Amino acid sequence: MPGRGIRSFMALCTAGAVACLLSAGLAANAQDREIKVGYMKNPIQDASLDMMEKWAKGHNVKLTRVPMAYSVFMEKVTATLTSGADQFDIIWHNDDWGQLWKKWLDTTDDIKGIDNADQWPLLAFWNDDRKLTVVPMAHTVGTFFYRSDLLRPEEVPTTFAQLVSISQRLQKEGKVKWGYVGGMSMNNTWFSLWWTMWANNCDILKPLFERDNAKLAAARFEPAVTEPCHREIVEFWWDAINTHKISPPGMTAYGRNEANAIFMAGDAAFTLVDSTHFGEFNDPKRSKIVGKVGMAPFPIGPRANKPTSWNEIWGWAIPKGVPAGRAKLAKEMLSGMMTDDAGQIEMWKKTGGPPPNIKLWPKLAAEDKDFAALKHAVFDQTPITHSAYYFAEWPAVHKAYSDMAIAALSGKREDIPKVLAEHVDNIQRAATGN
């Protein structure tokens, strides 16, 4: 009996050990079949994730979404990247911080379908070895929106002067409270100051429109903010708010959400924001102007003779700290997204996010009047430059610029040249890291 008891005990121990090993192996395998995505909660990112989810379900992969607020996203993900942790297998990527993250990201040249992406918006995402570090999610393009129930296409303003006069007419007729509303606060500069800056043949640094970092450095990152072309756009917005009163007096503090809310309430005739908000404007639960929104090229300033545009992307990236097995799986999932034509078309219809596969654009333009309008407003226009700079100190430059612009718009009109000049050194120091 004692001998049989010992043998039985040893057999149980062996069986238990085997079971533990099998369980550990299954757990490890299950972990390897899970992909965690860190992203900003946003309809277009959710639509892109829906395509990945479809692929994941068909390949026995668990997709875990980890949403974060925009205000904490960059800081949190940067900390993860620099520590080499594998908290996320895929992360949302943006041209604003493309150069900041390039050395911590896996390359994506081997993603299936990447050759169907537009090359222009990829400038921010090449690493020092000239390897790509992004997979496009959707194009984020500045789009001039107007109330199509108030204006026929041929009546839409094509110049800054017409934007003022038509806004005032619509206000006088009692059709809108405001002519133009757009974001203007830090991180929303594109939707007022910057689109008009580029539309007036101007830029932030010299040489104008240059994005080659070596050439910018050779020019000592000299600000262009005291140039007449730049002073004119600050004066334009001062007048829009204080003299012509076509824009709200509090607009210097508006982000895109505040501006969008006014536009969707039917209180403004015009706005400019990323096309990805087109879906919001046509959401009956949020908007009073469903089916009443048109798109047109940017109105131009006195120094320009044709419209410009900006055409950038949101994307996905894979951190270098991700174990090889999961990185391979992440690439397969992103390949599935890039080759899902039906999913990309559905993303456009639901959110207004133009597909990353540009070979779909002609078909969409032929079949969808809204995409045809967007194509005319943005993709048929030639961008004068990229809508950001791609050196590591760019976020600091953006902040210094925003401080300058808000200070100038908050003071007296006659003081604008002085305020711009006073901030030149701050912008230059931000650019050089001093």
Residue ranges and their predicted role:
Residues 41-62, 234, 401:
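Short, polar/charged alpha-helical segment
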Residues 51, 232-326:
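Extracytoplasmic/periplasmic substrate-binding proteins
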Residues 94-142, 158, 162-166, 192, ...:
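Hinge/lid segment of periplasmic solute-binding proteins
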Residues 99, 274-288, 301-403, 431-433:
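C-terminal lobe and pocket-closing loops
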Residues 33-34, 57-58, 62, 172, ...:
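Conserved C-terminal helix/tail region of periplasmic/extracytoplasmic solute-binding proteins
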Residues 167, 211-251:
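Glycine-centered hinge/linker elements that transmit conformational signals in sensory
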Residues 33, 54-120, 133, 149-158, ...:
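Extracytoplasmic "Venus flytrap"/periplasmic binding protein-like
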Residues 19-28:
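C-terminal segment of classical bacterial N-terminal signal peptides
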